Amino acid sequence: MNQLDTKFGEFGGMYVPELLIPALDQLEKAFLDAKEDPSFNEEFLSLLKDYAGRPTAMTLTRNLVSNPKVKLYLKREDLLHGGAHKTNQVLGQALLTKRMGKKEVIAETGAGQHGVATALACALLGLKARIYMGAKDVERQAPNVFRMKLMGAEVIPVNAGSGTLKDAVNEAMRDWSANYDTAHYLLGTAAGPHPFPTIVREYHRMIGEETRAQIMEKEGRLPDAVVACVGGGSNAIGMFADFIDEPSVRLVGVEPAGKGVHTKEHGATIVTGTKGILHGAYTFIMQDKEGQIEESYSVSAGLDYPAVGPQHAYLHDIGRAEYVAATDEEALNAFQLLARKEGIIPALESSHALAHALNMADEAEEETIIVVNLSGRGDKDLAHVINILGDDL
């Protein structure tokens, strides 16, 4: 019997081959045992603080917003070791891997950020890492591939399907099915079968907890809105978790509208998708009338995923969080604007959240505090952006 809820309303669940159920049950048990173990929590917190660099800063933007009624803050996950929020939960799951007595880690990666975080945690904790990456993403994200190899991880390009994140997840799950006795599948987002969405949320929830404490200290009140980009949705759920029970705080998730949600080229799963099962969970997915998974698209490899974490599906369903979409063009504009106005180069993923937050700031008619989760830094995207913008910089 599962001790944790396996679902969020009708969403979530464990739609996996029978042979993986014991591995998922073992993971849930390890997670619950670890939660009650002071030495585990102490080690996790000490790694977050002394290795990863938490708490991360909360920066009030100075020049970005022209509306005098708006204060726009950035939660600086881009300053975390590894370059993005990914490091938080990866350290937690890597510690769980050791706790379960396993020596190997299997992971998938899109932008390469989760792969880098997995590689650094495995290097630190003496685990062997096998990282699956879509062949197309291997090309798009060369610096991250080199980083992973430098830290001792094996990077396996996946040519199947469209050669992107979805295909990498399929291969990683196939590997895990064959090797779950010795290897832990370190899922990189708040999606997939139970207990992954819950574990990933809990190991990212310090993002929202720190945000609450920092904004109370700076402003003496909670923010009016927290805004985060949503691919699978791990940085967003980490930001939202501590505010779900605060009805005065708007939770805004920003999906990739790609070349426009009216085209076929986007990844706006909640905004345009329908309910179905992908990678072990019932959630919103992008599928055609026959139920075939459609290809998602985004300028940012990390948002290019045709499903979404089940808790986001649930928060949308009950109306607690709102989900919108920002186009490639809007994200690229926000990317350049933050660099020019504040001297901070954000990841293309985070630029989607920023783009929508800037629209919210323009429209605000009363005193408003907005916090954007700046989930990662843009170093990994520079070559990609230069290719797109060319001489227009």
Swiss-Prot record:
Keywords: Amino-acid biosynthesis, Aromatic amino acid biosynthesis, Lyase, Pyridoxal phosphate, Tryptophan biosynthesis. PROSITE patterns: TRP_SYNTHASE_BETA. It catalyses: (1S,2R)-1-C-(indol-3-yl)glycerol 3-phosphate + L-serine = D-glyceraldehyde 3-phosphate + L-tryptophan + H2O. The modification N6-(pyridoxal phosphate)lysine is found at K86. GO terms for cellular component: cytoplasm. Signal peptide: none annotated. Belongs to the TrpB family. This is Tryptophan synthase beta chain. The gene is trpB.
